[in-house]
Design a protein with these regions (language model features):
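N-terminal Rossmann NAD(P)H-binding glycine-rich loop of SDR-like oxidoreductase domains
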Residues: 6-24
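N-terminal Rossmann-fold cofactor-binding loop
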Residues: 31-36, 53
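Rossmann-fold cofactor-recognition segment
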Residues: 44-56
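NAD(P)H-binding glycine-rich loop region in Rossmannoid oxidoreductase-like domains
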Residues: 53-96, 127
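NAD(P)-cofactor binding segment of oxidoreductase domains
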Residues: 71, 86-116, 153
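Conserved Rossmann-fold NAD(P)-dependent oxidoreductase catalytic core, especially the SDR/UDP-sugar
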Residues: 101-147, 168
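Active-site Tyr-X1-5-Lys
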Residues: 143-168
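Conserved small/polar residues in nucleotide/adenosyl-binding loops
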Residues: 173-178
Length: 178
């Protein structure tokens, strides 16, 4: 059975991803803080791990222990992140630095997945053309205008420079369309 880790699994999107992974037959691991609500993670088949992203060395040791006990994950969906904060430095610490720490720790611990999916945001492109309202295209330059968007772009760019690491970047956005 293939194993998947979903970070940020306690949130709305993460909880949905965990349920979908179970439905598809994956051994599903939810990366959540010990203080996080697990209301969206009630299925008894979900396994939990509390990863310490902020300390790369500790995270590497934690993942190496995981690999010895359970083997590596086949897939990682990195959905953990910060969307609101009073201190803008937290965007960069959580969204960019913790992403880099996770990628480095996965590689260094022998836990590099077959595929790593970074859940990012259309905010990494900025507002787009507000005169013509032309939809944003992946060919457009990324010009984020918020610290949140800038931190997501920093994480994307870090990942793009890791040629040894198999990844996909998923851009999420909200729509008011019915």
């Amino acid at each position: 059975m293939k194993k998947i880790l979903i970070t940020g699994a306690s949130g709305f999107i993460g909880g949905f991803l965990a349920k979908e992974a179970l439905n598809r037959g994956y051994e599903t691991w939810a990366g959540v803080r010990s203080t996080s609500s697990r209301v969206n993670l009630q299925d008894e088949r979900i396994r939990f791990i509390d990863l310490k992203y902020s300390d790369r060395e500790s995270l590497t040791a934690q993942l190496a222990d995981f690999v010895r006990e359970h083997g590596p994950w086949d897939y990682v969906i990195h959905n953990a992140g910060l969307t609101k904060t009073l201190d803008k430095r937290n965007f960069y610490r959580i969204n960019a630095q913790n992403t880099a720490n996770l990628i480095e720790a996965l590689a260094a611990s022998g836990c590099k997945p077959e595929k790593f999916l970074l859940m990012s945001s259309l905010s990494s492109y900025g507002r787009g053309d507000e005169k013509t309202f032309r939809p944003i295209s992946l060919d457009d330059p990324q010009l984020p205008d918020t610290d949140y968007g800038k931190s997501k772009l920093e994480a994307e760019n870090y990942l793009r420079h890791q040629s040894y690491f198999p990844y996909v970047i998923c851009l999420l956005y909200t729509s008011d369309a019915a």
